[in-house]
Amino acid sequence: MSDTDGKKPLGLGGGSRSGQVKQSFSHGRTKSVLVETKRKRVVVPKPGASGSSTTTSSPSHLGDPAKRPAGISDAEMERRLAALRAAKLREVEDAKRRADEERQREEERQRRREELEAKEREERERAEALRQKAEDEERARREAEEATRRAEEAKRAPAPAAPQPAPAESRASAPPSAKPGLPPSRKEREREADRDRTTKKDDSRRSGKLTLNEALSGEGGRTRSLAAMKRKQEKARQKAMGFGHKAEKQVRDVQLPETILVQELANRMAERAADVVKALMKMGMMVTMNQSIDADTAELVIEEFGHRAVRVSDADVEHVIDTVEDKAEDLQPRPPIITIMGHVDHGKTSLLDAIRKTSVVSGEAGGITQHIGAYQVKTESGAVLTFLDTPGHAAFTSMRARGAQVTDIVVLVVAADDAVMPQTVEAIKHAKAAKVPMIVAINKIDKPDADPNKVRTDLLQHEVIVEKMSGDVLDVEVSAKTGLGLDELLENIALQAEILDLRANPSRQAQGAVIEAKLDVGRGPVATVLVQYGTLKRGDIFVVGQQWGKVRALINDKGERVDEAGPSVPVEVLGLNGTPEAGDVLNVVETEAQAREIADYREKAARDKRAAAGAATTLEQLMAKAKADADVAELPVVIKADVQGSAEAIVQALEKVGNDEVRVRVLHYGVGAITETDITLAEASQAAVIGFNVRANASARQAANQKSVEIRYYSVIYDLVDDVKKAASGLLKAEVREHFIGYAQIKEVFRITGVGNVAGCIVTEGVARRSAGVRLLRDNVVIHEGTLKTLKRFKDEVKEVQSGQECGMAFERYEDIRPGDVIEIFEREEVQRKLA
C-alpha cells in the first residue's frame, strides 16, 4: 500500500478557515473582525464558442441587427446601451469621488498628525527650556557655593595647591550607565527594551487605523487610547509648567435671600450639597437638601466654607418704583388739598355743599357722612381747590387719619352751638400729627344760641390758639345755611395755599393715595385715587398695595371720563384685579411683570405677618390662648359693605364691642354684594351676615332661606353697632342677685324616722318659703347653705310660713342642726346684663 493511499493531494487552496480575526484594544478588550474574501467567478467557454463569447461582451455586437437577441427592438436596445453607458460613467465618478474623499481624509489625518507632533514638540521644547533653566539656576547656585567655600579655604590656607580635577567629580558628571569598559547590566537592558517598546507603541498609535494585515499578523495589539495619551501629555505639560500643586480655593460672593434651600445654597457656593448638610448637622440642624434655612444660618455656613455672604431681600423687587427727587425746574404749581374735619352733625358736608353749590348731605343715609368724598371746586377768582370730606362719627377714625395724611390744609369745622366735642379733639390730633396748617370754621353762626367765643375758649384747652386770641391759627365764622362767611373762608384757604407754595412735577410717573375703594357690580373694583405726583394716564400699569392693574378708565368727581389726571386731582380708577385697601399708595411701573411681582411680594409679606401675629410661639402660650378663648363667648359675624372704608370702620367699631366675657368676632369682611359664599361661611360658623348699603343676590337669599342664616341690612352705622351690642349682651351670663326674705330661730330638734333631724323653728322676721334657699348660721357664722327638704306647719306641708308663726324645717342632705341656730332664708334673682 502506498503512503498516499487515502489522502488528498496537497494544494495551495489551504484548509477551511473561520474567516474571523481577533482585534485587541487597550484595557484587555478584544473584538472579532469578520474577514470576507471577494471571489470572482470565471466562466470557461466551451470549445468552439470562444469567438461568440468575445463578441457578446462588446457593444458593437449588441448593435448588430444580425447578431441581436430575438424580440428586442432598436429603441429598447438604445435604452439599454444608454443605461449601460450611464452606469459605467457613474462607476467612474464614484471611483473618482471615493479617491478624492480618501485623499482628503488622508490629508486631514496628516494635518492632525503634524499638529499633534508640533504641539508635542513645542511642549517638549518648553519643558526642556524649563528644565535647562532650572539646571542653570542649580549650577549657578552650586558654583556660588563652591566659590564661597574656596574663598573660605583660601582664607584658612594662604598658599593652596593648584586644583586638580577630582576623579569623583568626573565620575559624577558622567551618566550612571556610562561605565567605561563594562557591558550594560541586565536591568539596564530591560529598561532600554521597555523604552523602545513604549516608543514603538506610541508610533503605532499615531500610525492611524488598524489594517487587515496587522490584525492577521497579530501586530498592533493592545495599545493606549487617545484619551490616555492626551492625559499623559497634559500631566507632563502641567508638571513642566509647575502646575502640579493644588489650585487655590476660589472665594465667591454668595447672594443670600431671607430664606434659601440647602441645595440652592450649595449650588451658589459651588460646593457639594452633602458637605453643606454635614456642616449644618455639626451646627445641630438636622435638615435635608430640599429644606429651607434662614439667612442667619446660611450666612454661618457660607463663612465656614470661606465665601462671602451678600444679603439680598425680597423687598428689592420694590426698587423699580421711581423714588427720584424732582428737580426744581420741573416743579409746577398745583391745587391745594383741603380736608374738612370735625365732629358729627357739625355741618361739614353742608359747608362743602354750600361751597360747591350742591346738595350731597340730602342723599346721605341718616343725614351723616359715612364715606370719604373727594371733590374739585373752581372759585370765582379762577383758583382750583381739591376738597376731601371725612366722616365725623367715632367709628371713622381711620378715614379721618387718611384724610389728614394726604392733605395740605385742614379746615376744622366746629358748631357754634355745640363747641368742642370728642371727634373735634381727635381731628386736632390728626392735624398736628400730619403737621399741616389748620383753619377753624365756626359753623352754624346763624343759630340763636350760637357762641363763637366759647368755641375759641374751648380750643385753647387743646393748644389751638386762633388769631382773635393772639394766636396764629386762622378762624372764620360761617353759616352753611345762609352762605355767610364762605368768601372769607375761601380767601383764607387761598392765602394759606399761597404761603405753602405747593408744587409738583407732572411729567414723572404717577403716584397717589387711595382715598376710598369699592367693588362695583358693573365696573368691578373701583378705587378713588388722589394723584399726588406725576400724571396718571389711561393705559398706565400700576401697583397699589397688594393689587395691581392697568388703567382702563379715569372718572372725575363730576362723573366724566378723562384721559389723564395731574397732581391734586381726585379720580376714580378702573382696571384693578382686586379691591385695594383704603390708604394704600398707587405707583405706576413699567411692565405688568414688575407690578405682578411687587403685588405678590406684598401679599406674601402680609400673609406671613398675619400668621406670625396669630401663632403661639410656645406650648405654654398655646395652652394659655386656648384656655382664654374657652372662657370668652364669641359672636361671629360676616360684614359686607359698599366701600372699603366703611367696612374698615365697621370692623374697628365692632372690635371695641365686648369685655372679658364676650367679644365680637369678624369672620370675614369685604366690599360688594352678599354672595352664596358668604352664606356658606356664615352657616359653617353659625354667624349672622350684616350688609351695609349692600344687598344679597338671588342665590344668596335662596341659600340663606335653606340654611336658616340670618341676613341684616343697615344704612346707618349707629344702628348696626347698637344691634350688635344687643346681640353680644345676650351672650353674657346673667347676674344673680339675692334678696333676704326672712329669719327663723331653731327652738328644738326632733328625730323623725324616714326624714331625719327636723328643726322646730319660729319665724322671727319676714317669711319662710319652701322654694327659697337657706343658710344655717351658728354664732353668726355660715356653716351650711342649701335648700329645704320639707316645710311643715303642725302636720301639714305648706309653701310658706309668715313671721311669728312656728314651723318645722328639714334640710336637704344635712342634719347637723342644734337648738339656738339661726336659719337665714333668701331668694335668688337672675338679672340680664348689658354691654356698656
Swiss-Prot record:
Residues 342-349 are annotated as: G1. Residues 367-371 are annotated as: G2. It is found in: Cytoplasm. PROSITE patterns: G_TR_2, IF2. Residues 1-234 are annotated as: Disordered. Residues 443-446 are annotated as: G4. Residues 479-481 are annotated as: G5. Belongs to the TRAFAC class translation factor GTPase superfamily. Classic translation factor GTPase family. IF-2 subfamily. HAMAP family: IF_2_B (MF_00100_B). This is Translation initiation factor IF-2. The lineage of its organism: Bacteria, Pseudomonadati, Pseudomonadota, Alphaproteobacteria, Rhodobacterales. The gene is infB.
